[in-house]
């Protein structure tokens, strides 16, 4: 639990991922540079995600200190492995992509153009970790 004394960024908490989780995180979740080199570790990823999620609070009039407290609380529960968000959130929060949803229902029009648009949209959603379904009604 975050106390009112925790107004600054929490120091990096020790995070122990299983060997399997470390492999998956390196392959799918950690940010990479233009040379495809990993540029963050688990604490960095959790901070990136926590800061991005908490930043939304500013849109609803929250003070900077409240945003920081929310970020720290979210960072703590992730670091303790009490809660881990879905894959698109881990991959995209705090990046230009920003898609956090995991599931999308796409329209499918009964024409060649509509089918090809659905195929394109499906590929783009899946590129960023989302799953797709189609509205056939």
Report each predicted region and the residues it spans.
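Extended catalytic cores of very large enzyme megasubunits
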Residues: 1-137
């Amino acid at each position: 639990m975050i106390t009112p004394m925790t107004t600054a960024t929490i120091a990096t908490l020790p995070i122990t991922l299983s060997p399997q989780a470390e492999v998956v995180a390196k392959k799918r979740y950690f940010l990479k540079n233009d040379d495809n080199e990993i540029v963050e570790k688990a604490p960095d990823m959790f901070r990136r995600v926590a800061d991005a999620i908490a930043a939304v609070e500013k849109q609803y009039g929250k003070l900077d200190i409240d945003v920081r407290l929310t970020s720290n609380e979210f960072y703590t529960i992730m670091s303790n492995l009490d809660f881990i968000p879905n894959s698109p959130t881990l991959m995209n929060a705090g990046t230009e992509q920003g898609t956090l949803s995991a599931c999308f229902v796409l329209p499918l029009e009964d024409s060649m153009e509509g089918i090809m648009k659905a195929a394109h949209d499906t590929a783009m959603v899946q590129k960023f970790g989302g799953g797709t379904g189609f509205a056939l009604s």
